[in-house]
């Protein structure tokens, strides 16, 4: 059975690059969202057992998504993928429930290592 994956970023190019970085043998069903509101809707529709989440987006940013997931007690493995590498941002997302923080641009090796670390693949 395919694992539902949600890639959330306001940049279509960034979403495409991240999707290309996913392990080719990984049995997944990939959905995409361009902002935080779309991400929450996709999550509620069952499309996000694992979510790759950008922080800086219009409408609702990644912090807002994490807060909404926490308030609604929704469980998803959230991996934040962001160019914002400030330690404060990293600490904040981890405190809000993210399982990992990956710096953009992503690499296939780094994504695989994070997924293996958390037993996703």
Please give the residue ranges for each predicted region.
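Two-component/phosphorelay signaling modules centered on CheY-like receiver
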Residues: 12-31, 96
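Active-site beta3 strand of CheY-like receiver
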Residues: 46-52
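Acidic catalytic/metal-coordinating carboxylates
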Residues: 35-38, 61-64
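Alpha4 helix (beta4-alpha4-beta5 surface) of REC/receiver domains from two-component response regulators
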Residues: 85-100, 113
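Receiver (REC) domain active-site loop signature in two-component systems and cognate sites
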Residues: 57
């Amino acid at each position: 059975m395919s694992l539902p994956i949600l890639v959330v970023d306001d940049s279509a190019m960034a979403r495409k690059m991240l999707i290309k970085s996913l392990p080719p043998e990984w049995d997944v069903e990939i959905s995409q969202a361009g902002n935080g509101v779309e991400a929450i809707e996709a999550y509620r529709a069952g499309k996000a057992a694992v979510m790759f989440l950008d922080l800086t987006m219009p409408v609702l940013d990644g912090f807002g998504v994490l807060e909404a997931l926490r308030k609604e007690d929704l469980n998803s493995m959230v991996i934040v993928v962001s160019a914002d590498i400030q330690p404060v941002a990293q600490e904040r997302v981890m405190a809000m429930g993210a399982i990992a923080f990956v710096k953009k641009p992503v690499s296939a090796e780094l994504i695989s290592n994070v997924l293996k670390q958390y037993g996703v693949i």
